[in-house]
């Protein structure tokens, strides 16, 4: 019996080490689609996709309080209509982030703050409960890194950290030129990446809530 317990303990420890040292850091190649499109910046599940008008984000995470777009980006935003897409990354998704479009990095800002857990969103995702963002206070509160990539159209990317994340990796900065699907960062464990871009004539959204996407490969919108 003791030998069995030791074997189980060793296998469990080995599995945990494999996940933490090998599986978590996997970085598969991706087929970057050609054409006029915006690709997913992260692997994960689409938790919301909606239009933002006058800076008002049409979701509520606490007591029906209206969220302002600038609460998510932590920086000033131009006026107008924007598409806002959220991608939740579970601990088992690939955690490498990729640029959604080609262009020049015009802006980068890191916002440090106390991190709240994302477990409510993970639970609702697993149970397929809608809306997936209910009670997800991390959307506006947690540490984050915001990028503005200016290409055919301006695209904001917001990396949002989870409770257990003490570091957001971002390997590009202001003035850098990037190509679509380029590796630009990583967030450890579970986390979230939001995507914001103008609602211009010809924009067509091709994802929906609950859909799983792959960074650099899955098309979010065409233009």
Model-derived segments and their meaning:
Residues 1-223:
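Contiguous, well-folded functional domains in the mature portion of proteins
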